[in-house]
Amino acid sequence: MALNAGSLAADLANRRELAPFWLVTGSEDLLMLESADLLRRRARELGYTDRQVLELSASADWSQLPDAAASIGMFDDKKFLEVRLPSGRPGIKGNKALPEFVERPVDGVVTLFTMPRPDWQGQKAAWWQALVKAATVVECDPVERAQLPQWLAGRMRANGQTAARDVLEAFADLVEGNLLAAKQEVGK
């Protein structure tokens, strides 16, 4: 299942349980950060109180991934495991470990993978195909210029503000391509 970052909050609000695997990926850092925050918050609301973060690289020891999933805290029965792949490539060890991991979900464990979207070659790799097949994918792509005024209006509404269409258009011209700057300006 694939969602875009803009529809994630509504989707999570309707879920009584989270899927075992989530993948937040794309090229828009702000949307990736906010999507991961939404997933963390919803997991906490649903009782996933044990949280562990792994940052894995191509040279990492990938055996820690299944070990981390298997080790739930003594006083917890649900775990939120966050796996960050900053390079977007798992390397040779991860190429093997990742598909094996997503084939066997661990009961009571939700795993969130965050990474930039791989290039076209990476998207053909078996590890990527296995991850996309097993996970609920949250696509975090840049907001197109045509949708930017609407995106800004939504941000302003959430902040208790309004603006006329021409103001939103001018605002969009100023921040085009930089959603973080747009978020900061709306927050002022």
Tell where the protein language model's regions lie, with residue ranges.
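Conserved beta/loop motifs at nucleotide-recognition and modification sites
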Residues: 1-188
